[in-house]
A protein has these predicted regions:
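Low-complexity, intrinsically disordered terminal/linker segments enriched in charged
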Residues: 133-152
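PDZ/PDZ-like groove recognition
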Residues: 151-177, 181-184
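Conserved PDZ fold ligand-binding element
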Residues: 177-200
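Surface-exposed, charged secondary-structure patches
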Residues: 71-116, 124
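Bacterial N-terminal signal peptides
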Residues: 7-16
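PDZ-domain C-terminal substructure recognizer with occasional recognition of PDZ-binding tails
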Residues: 164-167, 189, 203-243
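A short gly/proline-enriched turn/hairpin at secondary-structure junctions
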Residues: 51, 57-68
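Short, low-complexity N-terminal intrinsically disordered segments enriched in polar/charged residues
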Residues: 17-42, 46, 50
């Protein structure tokens, strides 16, 4: 989950410059970035991909996450658009040759689900001959710590997705889900009253995770049972789970 979240927070903001006409090439770096970000805010991932160099490199700190090439970047962009990102620039946009730098507040639906309105991050982007060649996101240390805390707890299960929700495949030996009465073959159909049918890809796992020691209410259909039941589980540190 954490890696997902790292990609989700790392790829867009709004600059507010004029869009680059398709006939202009190479465009100024700040205009290329603006076109990229406007397209991404509309969910137009294809336009975003067209503005990436074939050997584009994405890096995020302090996690050390690194993506190389268009394919992994495209995958992360398609995930990002499902969370309706909103960005607010909080510093002057600095342009030095082919490099652009700025700071922004990032707000996304996934952050709000976790209970965080936004994170602060610095961006360093290189544009070469009209294509984005490198993208570095440096998340504010305090915000990164908070994100880590908000996703540090879990219920100790391995899962697979089915039409009705999330089926339990395996439970950790010290799983709090097992202690609460959940067994292999059970299906989680809702989290804290939110139905699986209303969720986006990855949202159920996100809602199940949370700070260590907090409680999550799961609606569970036991294998072979006709009706679901609500079960409350206390999250434990993911690091202490043993499979």
């Amino acid at each position: 989950m954490r890696k997902v979240l790292i990609v989700l927070i790392s790829v867009i903001f709004m600059v507010g410059c004029a869009r680059v006409p398709a006939t202009q090439a190479p465009a100024k770096p700040e205009l290329v970035i603006d076109t990229f970000l406007q397209a991404l805010s509309r969910g137009d991932v294809d336009t975003c991909i067209s503005l990436l160099a074939d050997d584009v490199v994405f890096r995020q700190e302090p996690s050390g996450i690194k993506l190389e090439g268009k394919a992994p970047f495209e995958e992360s962009l398609r995930r990002v658009t499902t969370w309706h990102p909103q960005y607010s620039i909080v510093s002057p946009i600095k342009v030095n040759g082919d490099k652009v730098a700025f700071s922004a507040k990032l707000s996304e639906d996934d952050f709000k689900i976790l209970g965080l309105e936004y994170v602060n991050a610095d961006f360093e982007i290189q544009v070469w001959e009209g294509k984005i060649k490198s993208w570095v996101t440096i998340v504010n240390q305090a915000d990164w710590k908070r994100l880590t805390e908000l996703t540090a707890g879990g219920i100790g299960v391995k899962i697979e997705f089915v039409e009705q929700g999330m089926r339990i495949k395996e439970l950790a030996g010290n799983s709090p889900a097992y202690e609460a009465g959940i067994r292999s073959g059970d299906v989680i159909t809702a989290v804290n009253g939110v139905s699986y049918s209303q969720m986006r890809e990855g949202e159920m796992q996100l809602r199940i995770q949370g700070p260590v020691g907090t409680k999550v209410k799961l609606t569970v259909t036991h294998e072979g049972a006709p009706t679901p039941v609500d079960i409350e589980v206390t999250r434990v540190s993911l690091e202490q789970l043993r499979y």
